Amino acid sequence: MQIFVKTLTGKTITLEVESSDTIENVKAKIQDKEGIPPDQQRLIFAGKQLEDGRTLADYNIQKESTLHLVLRLRGGIIEPSLQALARKYNQEKMICRKCYARLHPRAKNCRKKSCGHTNQLRPKKKLK
């Protein structure tokens, strides 16, 4: 039977499959046509993400059904030097004990008028 796979760019791919084919097989056919690795593919049908081990029949996918292909988003790890820079920028601050203003690390007095430019400052608490 013939099914259609619609990509995010709007391109429609036609695939020749059997209802007993697994989702993994369909992803392999998409890789052959488009060059997208199966581990980066997510197939959606009727609002549900299709799992690799299941077959097309399990999802009631019939001839001329349209699947939607979405690329998997990879979570990122921040490079250690950038992570240290972000931590320095966000955590190394002084806090006013009266008005809780965040101040630069070498501050001696608060910059706000509301607390009378007090010199009662403390270091910002570190995240755990």
Swiss-Prot record:
Signal peptide range: none
Give the highest taxon in the source lineage.
Eukaryota
Q: Which InterPro entries match?
A: Ribosomal_eL40_dom, Ribosomal_eL40_sf, Ubiquitin-like_dom, Ubiquitin-like_domsf, Ubiquitin_CS, Ubiquitin_dom, Ubiquitin_ubiquitin-like
Identify the Gene3D superfamilies for this entry.
4.10.1060.50, Phosphatidylinositol 3-kinase Catalytic Subunit, Chain A, domain 1
Tell me which GO cellular component terms the UniProt record holds. cytoplasm; nucleus; ribonucleoprotein complex; ribosome
Give the position(s) of the covalent cross-link described as Glycyl lysine isopeptide (Gly-Lys) (interchain with K-? in acceptor proteins).
Answer: 76
One Gene Ontology biological process: translation
One Pfam entry name: Ribosomal_L40e
> One GO MF term, please?
mRNA binding
* Glycyl lysine isopeptide (Lys-Gly) (interchain with G-Cter in ubiquitin) cross-link, chain position(s): 48
Q: Write out the entry's keywords from A to Z.
A: Cytoplasm, Isopeptide bond, Nucleus, Ribonucleoprotein, Ribosomal protein, Ubl conjugation
Residue ranges of the Ubiquitin-like domain? 1-76
Family per similarity comment: In the N-terminal section; belongs to the ubiquitin family. In the C-terminal section; belongs to the eukaryotic ribosomal protein eL40 family.
Q: What is this protein called?
A: Ubiquitin-ribosomal protein eL40y fusion protein
Which organism does this record belong to?
A: Chlamydomonas reinhardtii (Chlamydomonas smithii)
Instruction: Write the lineage as a comma-separated list.
Output: Eukaryota, Viridiplantae, Chlorophyta, core chlorophytes, Chlorophyceae
